[in-house]
Curated annotation (Swiss-Prot):
Belongs to the class-I aminoacyl-tRNA synthetase family. Glutamate--tRNA ligase type 1 subfamily. ATP binds at K252. The keyword Cell inner membrane does not apply. One of its GO terms (molecular function) is glutamate-tRNA ligase activity. It comes from the Bacteria. Keywords: Aminoacyl-tRNA synthetase, ATP-binding, Cytoplasm, Ligase, Nucleotide-binding, Protein biosynthesis. GO terms for biological process: glutamyl-tRNA aminoacylation. This is Glutamate--tRNA ligase. A motif ('KMSKS' region) lies at residues 249-253. It catalyses: tRNA(Glu) + L-glutamate + ATP = L-glutamyl-tRNA(Glu) + AMP + diphosphate. InterPro entries: aa-tRNA-synth_I_cd-bd, aa-tRNA-synth_I_codon-bd_sub2, aa_tRNA-synth_I_cd-bd_sf, Glu-tRNA-ligase_bac/mito, Glu/Gln-tRNA-synth, Glu/Gln-tRNA-synth_Ib_cat-dom, Glu_tRNA_lig_a-bdl, GluQ/Sye.
Length: 494
């Protein structure tokens, strides 16, 4: 049988980085077994739908280079299909209609410790099991809102076979009669739509996060109620992604707390206008992020650390996935990104840099950008870092670091830099070798201290003490720009 897996996010906001790992593992599994990878948008909860979330999902995987073989399918467009299966369960007496209001349910929760709607409590509730058929039909005809609940028999043993966690058994008495359908929006809940779609789409393996493990017994019961027990997919529940300190699941709020992105792309809240950073906007390479995420919960069984997505699709195995949660080490993803940047040519990084800062660099010479990249690439961990490291090449400093001025700008600096600018004006071949030879010869002839000249010159050209070798800076900036910057610094700092 051909392997078929799916990634089924809800359009309720930005994708958590843990969801990206889940999608990646599904993708790798499909590619390894020459199967199909399907995108299904689970938008049955209309109260949580966020405009733009589906587009965000699609854009995320486009950036990552992860392609889907089918989809996106949208559950909101499949209402009629689900209603047929709801009616089937009702006709089989495997589900029932419940009219309990939110207020009535809340009162039960307040008055009964650990209340759940199950075989014990259902006969005390406001549903079709306690009402006559006539009363039930009357309420539906009068447009009374209702839900359809699954009817779970108590004292049954549910066996869950999981590729990662092995065999587990759960008593059905611990389960509640979950809501499968709501008349308020004529949509099923996640549980019913999920099972129906997985069956109709011939999903062979359900690979999802550990948080769904507790729902699996209910899903198995639904497969059995529909008579699909023999065609049930294989389950594999992935370990949680943990906070960097290992204390609990990595949440969407942890990004601000720990100071790193939790989302693949930037997300802007349509209500508040607040933007939350993403890995793409922070200058990360998609291949670096994929490599990092692949190793969060899966081990290839070797010392190898760097994998292309094609290599991963060959090596990936659910049997090598861990049961235990994986700490999210942000320093590690920074390290991976640094390594992947070093692997690229200066031209490739320059192209990324140019695209990343297109407005700031639109008038710059691409050759100059490439030369600049070659000097600073070894020091950066993201494309965004490049602007911090190289901005002075493209934009003259408007201010000068006060601490550096006090430390490096001397009383004689204006006179010395005036002489230097006059010297530079005489150079016709402004190559690195000629510039360095000329300046060093002038320093020796004048008896100046080299560091005093170099430090003051760097301050004038850069505005602070950072940057590559001063002669490289002078060559790339060019004679005219260097002289302009020196004169400006003398005027401002005199």
């Amino acid at each position: 049988m051909k392997a078929r897996v799916r990634f089924a996010p809800s359009p309720t906001g930005p994708l958590h980085i843990g969801s990206i790992r889940t999608a990646l593992y599904n993708y790798l599994f499909a590619k390894k077994y020459h199967g199909d990878f399907i995108l299904r948008i689970e938008d049955t909860d209309s109260t949580r739908f966020i405009p733009g979330a589906e587009e965000y999902i699609i854009e995320t995987f486009k950036w990552l280079g992860i392609t889907f073989d089918e989809g996106p399918y949208r559950q909101s467009e499949r209402k009629a299909i689900y209603k047929e299966y709801v009616d089937e369960l009702l006709n089989k007496n495997l589900a029932y209609i419940a009219f309990d209001t939110p207020e009535e349910l809340e009162a039960k929760r307040r008055n009964i410790p650990n209340f759940q709607y199950d075989a014990i409590t259902r006969m005390t509730m406001n549903n079709s099991l306690t009402l006559s058929k006539e009363e039930t039909k009357k309420r539906i005809a009068n447009s009374n809102q209702y839900v359809v609940r699954i009817k779970i028999d108590p004292n049954q043993t549910i066996i869950v076979n999981d590729l990662i966690r092995g065999e587990m058994s759960i008593s059905s008495s611990t389960l509640d009669d979950k809501v499968l359908y709501k008349s308020s929006d004529n949509l099923p809940t996640y549980h019913l739509a999920n099972i129906v779609d997985d069956h109709l789409m011939k999903i062979t393996h359900v690979i999802r996060g550990e948080e769904w493990l507790s729902s699996t017994p209910l899903h198995i019961i639904l497969y059995q109620y529909f008579g699909w027990g023999e065609k049930m997919p294989v389950f594999a529940h992935l370990p949680l992604l943990l906070k960097p300190d290992g204390k609990g699941k990595l949440s969407k709020r942890d990004g601000e707390r720990f100071g790193f992105p939790i989302f693949p792309l930037q997300w802007t809240d349509s209500k508040t206008g607040k933007s939350i950073s993403g890995y793409r906007e922070d200058g990360y390479l998609p291949e670096a992020l994929i490599n990092f995420l692949a190793l969060l919960g899966w081990n290839p069984g070797s010392e190898q650390e760097f994998f292309s997505i094609d290599e991963l699709s060959v090596l990936f195995s659910l049997k090598k996935c861990s049961k235990n949660g994986a700490k999210f080490d942000y320093k590690k993803v920074e390290w991976f990104n640094h390594q992947y940047i070093q692997k690229k040519s200066d031209k490739e990084i320059a192209e990324l840099f140019f695209h990343f800062y297109s407005k700031k660099l639109e008038k710059q010479d691409f050759k100059k950008i490439t030369e600049v990249i070659g000097m600073v690439k070894g020091r950066i961990s993201s494309i965004r870092d490049l602007w911090y490291e190289t901005a002075f090449f493209f934009v003259a400093p408007n201010t000068y670091d006060e601490k550096i001025v006090q430390k490096r700008w001397r009383a004689e600096s204006p006179i010395q830099l005036t002489e230097l600018s006059e010297l530079l004006a005489t150079i016709t071949n402004f190559s690195l070798q000629i510039v360095e030879k000329t300046i060093r010869g002038w320093i020796n002839n004048k008896g100046y201290h080299p560091s005093n000249i170099m430090n003051a010159c760097r301050l004038a050209l850069v505005g602070t003490a950072k940057g590559p070798g001063i002669f490289h800076i002078i060559e790339i900036l060019g004679k005219e720009e260097v002289i302009i910057r020196i004169k400006k610094a003398i005027q401002v700092l005199r």
